[in-house]
Amino acid sequence: MVSEHISTQQVGPDALFSPLGWDLLALALYVALACIIVVSLLLAARFLGHRSRTPLKNLPYECGVEPTGPARPGYPVPFYLTAIFFVVFDVEVAFIASWAVAYDLLGWAGLAQIAFFIITLLVALIYLWRRGALDWGPQRR
């Protein structure tokens, strides 16, 4: 019976592509056409555009004023530390909030896991505090 079913199937252009196959073919043609347009516009701008290379063209534009210093001033380290601490504790809040939503489903195992997580972060915070990572003032010598 299986051999009869296989032998009676017709193979035509519609049988090669399922409806999803036609959608993917249309998407592939769209992406290819978009890439061709982008590349052709970039090449046209490259070959047809006006080029003038002067030292003045290489300077950054600051509202018509000549640049006076470096483009990227350095920021004090405490700002970076604050950003890193924010990310660490923001992730901690996300874990604790997700635990709080499902605490009744997690049982004692979930409580033990979140307690271990909080204790680990508290130990890390105490370590950073002892090392002086949280001190913003002048360094003691």
From Swiss-Prot:
Segments traversing the membrane: 24-44, 77-97, 106-126
Top-level taxon in the UniProt lineage: Bacteria
Enzyme Commission (EC) number: 7.1.1.-
Localization: Cell inner membrane
Reactions that this protein is recorded to catalyse: a quinone + NADH + 5 H(+)(in) = a quinol + NAD(+) + 4 H(+)(out)
Disulphide connectivity of cysteines: none
Topology with respect to the bilayer: Multi-pass membrane protein
Pfam family, one: Oxidored_q4
Subunit structure comment from the entry: NDH-1 is composed of 14 different subunits. Subunits NuoA, H, J, K, L, M, N constitute the membrane sector of the complex.
Protein family membership: Belongs to the complex I subunit 3 family.
Record-given protein name: NADH-quinone oxidoreductase subunit A
Lineage: Bacteria, Pseudomonadati, Thermodesulfobacteriota, Desulfuromonadia, Desulfuromonadales
